[in-house]
């Protein structure tokens, strides 16, 4: 989908699943973490004009897909999954929360702040193909949704291209509205959220999208 910076933990989870599927391991730990809320990290993203300027209302600054979104809010944290061969997990008697049915990646390296639609389209189609699923079999999508003007619009365009008319029936949210953007830790924690959504099953509240951009509806 994009350069490794914000996707490497999802790559790690997908590759770990493939390692288990090949029979090279029974159990893998995979995920990511990031801690970049510092002068260098904030200064770099500020110079790129990627951060929200809503300093007067920081609690309302991270608002993916909202018409007044103006950039992301940096977050810190970690998310790690325990991946395990199904027979191995059953033999141990552990609770199984979800199955990784498919995985796609597309490091198109187009541009770090102005992504192309082609990358996420190929990524989602690859995941569907590996899972042996049709687009209309998907109910929920945890979007990348960083709260940037160009990035969110590009992602919605890609979702529409992959899912067609079914896109209007998808439950789509961005949990970055609650956590901010964890960069290299985003995929790990968002994978945990997605597993929890399957477990409960619920789609977690999408905060602060007061009015969705008209061209994104």
Q: What does each of the following model-derived ranges do?
A:
Residues 109-120, 146-163, 182-189:
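Short glycine/threonine-rich loop-to-helix capping motif typified by GTGT followed
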Residues 19-22, 42-55, 118-119, 154-166:
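A glycine- and small-aliphatic-rich helix-loop capping segment at beta-alpha/alpha-beta transitions
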Residues 2-9, 205-212:
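Conserved small/polar residues in nucleotide/adenosyl-binding loops
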Residues 34-66:
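Phosphate/pyrophosphate-binding betaalpha-module
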Residues 56-131, 140:
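Condensing-enzyme catalytic core mediating Claisen C-C bond formation in acyl metabolism
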Residues 12, 123-131, 158, 162, ...:
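Stable alpha-helical structural segments in soluble proteins, enriched in small hydrophobic residues
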Residues 9, 16, 45, 82, ...:
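Conserved small-residue
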Residues 4, 8, 174-178, 183-184:
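Active-site nucleophile and cofactor-binding loops and adjacent substrate-binding regions
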